[in-house]
């Protein structure tokens, strides 16, 4: 009788762990945080790649910091992906097929994106000035904004 009771308890305990064994990642907050981080990382890296891929390392950092500044502003959405894919904000969105043609530029964009998502201020000037906008030097938009600086082929702006 004692043997039967012990065996029953062992079976019951074993069965209670089956859902975890079937899918160990279900409802795992650490896994979910990792998945969300990877999603935001890819959005940031794509934006850096398509907006500043040919720019210097500093130029890439500045573009990433603008995205971070927007995430921290009440004027814009609250996640990197929402900021990047917000309608009419970045010229590449909707105009590229997503193909990564330059592996080196992509790797550097990923590295800058990771830095942007894990460090507080990656580009001091853009961060301190709260720059929220930039454009290529090849265009001349009629913006009523305060010009902060030019880095490479981009001019950065903040609200007045």
Give the location of each predicted region:
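N-terminal signal peptide c-region/cleavage motif recognized by signal peptidases
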Residues: 17-19
């Amino acid at each position: 009788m004692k043997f039967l009771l012990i065996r029953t308890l062992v079976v019951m305990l074993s069965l209670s762990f089956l859902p975890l064994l079937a899918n160990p990642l279900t409802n795992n907050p650490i896994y979910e945080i990792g998945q969300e981080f990877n999603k935001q990382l890819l959005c940031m890296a794509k934006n850096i790649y398509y907006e500043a891929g040919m720019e210097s390392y500093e130029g890439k950092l500045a573009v990433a910091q603008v995205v971070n500044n927007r995430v921290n502003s009440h004027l814009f959405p609250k996640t990197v992906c929402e900021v990047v894919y917000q309608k009419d904000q970045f010229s590449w969105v909707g105009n590229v097929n997503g193909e990564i043609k330059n592996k080196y530029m992509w790797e550097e964009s990923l590295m800058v994106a990771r830095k942007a998502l894990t460090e507080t201020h990656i580009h001091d000037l853009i961060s301190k000035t709260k720059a929220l906008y930039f454009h290529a030097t090849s265009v001349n938009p009629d913006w009523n904004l305060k010009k902060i600086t030019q880095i490479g082929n981009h001019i950065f702006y903040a609200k007045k």
